[in-house]
Curated annotation (Swiss-Prot):
GO terms for cellular component: cytosolic small ribosomal subunit. This is Small ribosomal subunit protein uS3. Residues 39-110 form the KH type-2 domain. Belongs to the universal ribosomal protein uS3 family. GO terms for biological process: translation. GO terms for molecular function: mRNA binding; rRNA binding; structural constituent of ribosome. Binds the lower part of the 30S subunit head. Binds mRNA in the 70S ribosome, positioning it for translation. InterPro entries: KH_dom, KH_dom-like_a/b, KH_dom_type_2, KH_sf_prok-type, Ribosomal_S3_C_sf, Ribosomal_uS3_bac-typ, Ribosomal_uS3_C, Ribosomal_uS3_CS. It holds the Pfam family Ribosomal_S3_C. Keywords: Ribonucleoprotein, Ribosomal protein, RNA-binding, rRNA-binding.
Length: 244
């Protein structure tokens, strides 16, 4: 069953959290759900070069909180935070409410090569440049292994290398326990547009197991203490709306 169901959906409330956190009555629920989709689509299209891994949305009364997980936060923040104001006005225009309070937090992805979506995006970019798919997969696996992931599975499907008949090929390195609910599986999909058609990309990344009474997974053999040599991931929190 673990191979049939969506890896994220089956782990909601165990190791995964919802990407949208808010409550609404049945009449306004569809409108807010479409609003979240428009916001994510707008951000992904506007910041293609920022390496955005995920967009989390939360609502509190009339305030909208948007958290961006990105590999290059400087592209979004800009000089002296000018990019934040531009992004806020763009979100307000997208949802059609200029008076809505929008709070934006930009969080840097600590390990880019251990993120499933960023790995899938890297594979898609290489395939669109006509790089051989086996070479691309091998390079992605090497990058993930250097990042310290415990397991990785990559699947690519379509007209591989321009073949007449579409097929799917996959590779796996390490452990990817899809049946274990306490396993933190980072899953992402991406579509690569090539001259021969579109290729579907799926990436599973196993980062560790969440044991009872633990909030974050600890990889095998690692220590919970952070070494002094490791750099803290950058986080930019928007406080411009406070006090209004």
């Amino acid at each position: 069953m673990g191979h049939k169901i969506h890896p994220t959906g089956i782990r909601l409330g165990i190791t995964q959290e919802h990407r949208s956190k808010w409550y609404a009555p049945s009449k306004t629920y569809p409108l807010l759900l479409q609003e979240d989709d428009r916001i994510r689509t707008f951000i992904k299209k506007k910041y293609l070069a920022a390496g955005i891994s995920d967009v989390l949305i939360a609502r509190k009364a009339d305030q909208l909180e948007v958290e961006l997980k990105t590999a290059r936060p400087g592209v979004i923040v800009g000089r002296q935070g000018s990019g934040i104001e531009e992004l806020r006005s763009g979100i307000q225009k997208t949802i059609g409410d200029r008076n809505r309070q929008v709070r934006i937090n930009v969080v840097e992805v600590e390990k880019v090569d251990a993120d499933a979506y960023l790995l899938a995006e890297y594979i898609a970019q290489q395939l669109e440049k006509r790089v051989a798919f086996r070479r691309t997969i091998r390079m992605a696996v090497q990058r993930a292994q250097r990042a310290g992931v415990l397991g990785l599975k990559i699947q690519v499907g379509g007209r591989l290398n321009g073949a007449e008949i579409a097929r799917s090929e996959w590779t796996r390195e390490g452990r990817v326990p899809l049946h274990t609910l306490r396993a933190e599986i980072d899953y992402a999909t991406k579509v690569a547009s090539t001259t021969y058609g579109v290729l579907g990309i799926k990436v599973w990344v196993f980062k560790g197991e969440v044991l009872p009474k633990e909030e974050q997974p600890l990889p095998v053999g690692s220590s919970p203490r952070r070494s002094r040599g490791n750099r803290r991931p950058q986080q930019f929190e928007d406080r411009s709306n406070e006090g209004k």
